[in-house]
Amino acid sequence: MQPVGSAPRLAVLVAMVVLASSAACCRAQLASNFYAGKCGNTSVEVVIQVAVKARLVWDKRMVAGLLHLLFHDCFVQGCDASLLLDGPNTEKTAPQNSGIFGYDFIDDIKSELEAACPGVVSCADIIIAATRDAIALCGGPSYAVTLGRRDGMSSVSWMASDLPSPHVDIATAIGMFAKKGFNSFEMATLMGAHTVGVTHCSVIDDRLRNFNGTGKADPSMDPTYAWILTTFACPKGQAFDNIVYLDEPSSILIFDKSYFNQILSGRGVLAVDQALGMDPATAWMVQFFATTDFFPAMFAHSITKLAALEVKTGTAGEIRRNCRLTN
């Protein structure tokens, strides 16, 4: 057993080591000024930022959509916009991706950039830059992105099995992230994106009403919170599969550390959320992020690393004219 206080001290040490090494992570063939001078008088990143700002005015949920889209794209075949491709048996058709939204928004940005400089800006880069802007505009960290990704030319539904499910146990999740080069601390950090996350009642119905066939709510969930969700968000006989926010009501769609406090209160919405705070391998990480101010910097590091996962550069892939179709 660790001495009292050793876990927080270890967390600070881990965070400092990770952040110190982040600048060199995975950026060899990407560049912060990749599109400089390549789109006439148009600034690619300004176009994306303006579009994100305008969308968030009336659709703040888009921050959740973009984060979800980025993670599900990058975790399968790398950050190559393969998730955007239409067609039978593509990643988009996989059950794991049924809740993804924001495709139309990426299309809108792509259309604007194609009008300014055809065949220059990749769909993969649009996802990365738009997500960065949405995070910052919703109160999260501002961080630099490197660009120069190219778009993938294949998309296969079965490869979505690389994605962890909302019900995955922590040991399995750690293994899945490790295969992609992420340690458990980075995994817990990325799960902090659930501070602006959303799900649907159908995903958590078993936790609310029939946990492990007991006919009762998951005992790890705060009983009052379970009652609130079953009474107001997910009542029996609802006509629609309602949206449920993954963070507390006072912090919905605000990018902060409150997600971790929510878990400490037994109010993790997804099974994997609450498991993060209960498994000995990660419980101390939840405590650490909830009680310190390291989360923004660690998240900036971890999502930057994710955004550089298995990227296609140089002559690999292509620059799609339409994000839904290969050229």
Predicted regions span which residues?
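Catalytic cores of secreted/periplasmic or lumenal enzymes
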Residues: Q2-N327
